[in-house]
Amino acid sequence: LIKIANLPFVDQIKPVVGYTRTSSLEYSDIDPSSRDFDYGNALEQIEQINVRELHEQGYTGNGVRILVMDTGFSLTHNSLLGINVIEQWDVLKNDQETADETEQEVAVNQDYHGTAVLSTIASNAPGEFMGVAFNAEFLLAKTEDVAQEVQLEEDNYVAGLEWGEENGADVVSTSLGYLDWYEYSDMDGNTAVTTIGVDIAASLGVVCVTAAGNSGSSSWYYIIAPADADSVISVGAVDDNDIIATFSSHGPTSDGRIKPEVCARGRQTWCVNPNSNTNYSRLSGTSLACPLVAGAAALIIQARPDWSAMEVREAMMMSASNADNPDNTYGYG
């Protein structure tokens, strides 16, 4: 290790630590019989963030490219069959298959989380379920191993970001976060590998949206990396009455900045049931709130293609319900 560390192109060597991951989602299977308008079950969560008005003006994500990085993606559900997937990359195996490939992956539901997340942006099943940016183009990157959490996954995350930027991503949605090898003092916007990565991506013009984290009722309490980045849109979770979910992580960052930036439905959020090709479910977590906001960002980009990533971020914050009095629970609303 000493010899490697002394090589001129090596900046630093860090130990790899890990722990077994537990699911951050609460599951409740629902029969798809409850429908309302063309949005189906998605109506309330779409109206809650004022997306319906944008759709009615013709902004549905057309021509905007969204990178979704997660645990993997199954595209066999009826509402996902026709979505416009441009490229896929399994960073773990370095191939182009992001759905479950092995018996082990099937056993642990590897692509479950990513499929649910993707569906809230991309689904296109009028009368049943519609995503926020259903006409967008999608890049899908599988960066996470659900069986464990290791620091290598931050490198996978950054590799996915680089791949997405090289392939023309306008928006990145990442319902992922890292804290187990960090202290709260590291949530300063300049320390975590993924935090640095999203700031670089934003500087290159990519609107970066990430989940704030589900630590609000734990001893950690605060947002997790990369939600501490100063250029990211971190997203907290609220219920259908706009009340913050108890699990939603809070700010501030360790250097005093307000977090999260905004909130969306993350309590009993409608999505596809990843274990079915026809049914829908309600899941809870900032993981579900994040893609709703990422989809909204794509609509803004379609409407204002000349805006920078930071201008899109500012527009979302300044037009949110709490913009006049932002705090470390709801952010700007």
Residue ranges and their predicted role:
Residues 1-46, 52-55, 230:
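Autoinhibitory propeptides
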Residues 55, 60-62, 124-127, 140-231, ...:
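Substrate-binding/access-modulating region of protease and related hydrolase catalytic domains
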Residues 235:
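Alpha-helical segment proximal to the catalytic Tyr-Lys
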